[in-house]
């Protein structure tokens, strides 16, 4: 039996270039408001929506995220997207996680600005199938 069976895990993805207090506030609110067991921060490896030429290298962004989440025992950093060779599409990441941890309930956390064009994402229906979608409204914090 896997150690995440039946657990509620929040997923907060992004370029995190850099990670900032807003990301941490969104994660804390989701953790508290939805009684999550953990929130996993997932830095994008090859983001479909960003020009990577000016971005900080993925391993450095992962290091920044790891340092930022270290004080919080319920925050974790995952390199699942950085380790992947393909473009970091959310539906692929959630599919991988759901295959690894089939009994875990995932909560995908996104900002309200992303909701405006969520229907343009690659396979939003798979995202909704693999996770509960939480939308963070900025004026909440």
Predicted regions and their residues:
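Nucleotidyltransferase catalytic core that binds NTPs
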Residues: 1-141
């Amino acid at each position: 039996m896997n150690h995440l069976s039946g657990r509620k895990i929040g997923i907060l993805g992004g370029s995190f270039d850099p990670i900032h207090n807003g990301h941490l506030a969104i994660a804390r609110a989701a953790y508290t408001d939805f009684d999550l067991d953990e929130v996993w921060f997932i830095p994008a490896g090859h983001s479909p929506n960003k020009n990577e030429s000016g971005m900080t290298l993925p391993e450095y962004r992962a290091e920044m995220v790891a340092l930022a989440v270290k004080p919080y025992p319920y925050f974790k950093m995952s390199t699942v997207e950085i380790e992947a060779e393909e473009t970091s599409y959310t539906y692929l990441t959630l599919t991988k996680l759901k295959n690894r941890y089939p009994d875990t309930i995932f909560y995908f956390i996104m900002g309200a600005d992303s909701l405006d064009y969520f229907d343009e994402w690659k396979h939003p229906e798979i995202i909704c199938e693999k996770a509960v979608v939480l939308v963070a409204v900025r004026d909440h914090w």
